[in-house]
């Protein structure tokens, strides 16, 4: 399931993000790669414990916490602290790879916790017209999905996916990436719950909150979530 979540960050928050990134201490992105993915990773990344990273993390988490589509699609149990990367110049691509199944938090208030990477997420921080290339390419059973979104939008996709970032040939692609351990481990079950939730939201707007069918379907949604969720 690939989900486009719009307007996670407001225009004011994006401006604040750009101001913070203007003096960012970019470093070699290979430091967070596994042995295999390090062979194809060629980008830059902000150090996890740097104050700029921590300020950006607060902005991103605030955007996620208020966004109903993000919650509906991801059903987050744990969110790995957001990381920030840059593709451009000679450090401009990341070849095909699969994310590690479990990530270990090494800084911040949740240091020492492990996060199972059920859902991968990329939040775009640069407008698409400011750089060439840089598409996130996600391989799934329907073929290759190419993603290049407006600044402030994000994409959610299964952590099991083979994916890559195409070479950036002009400008710089700046983004945020992180992983989610979901209350519902199965991608198929999350997809069904998200689709049901979106249809319910439509029915609630068009039929009303007190319609018997709407109340019954709401109960079915929550009973399925109760059956499948692990909190």
UniProtKB/Swiss-Prot annotation:
It comes from the Bacteria. GO terms for molecular function: 2-oxoglutarate-dependent dioxygenase activity; iron ion binding; L-ascorbic acid binding. Residues 78-182 form the Fe2OG dioxygenase domain. This is PKHD-type hydroxylase Lcho_1570. Its EC number is 1.14.11.-. Fe cation binds at residues 97, 99, 163. 2-oxoglutarate binds at residue 173. It holds the Pfam family 2OG-FeII_Oxy_3. Its cofactor is Fe(2+); L-ascorbate. It comes from Leptothrix cholodnii (strain ATCC 51168 / LMG 8142 / SP-6) (Leptothrix discophora (strain SP-6)). Binds 1 Fe(2+) ion per subunit.
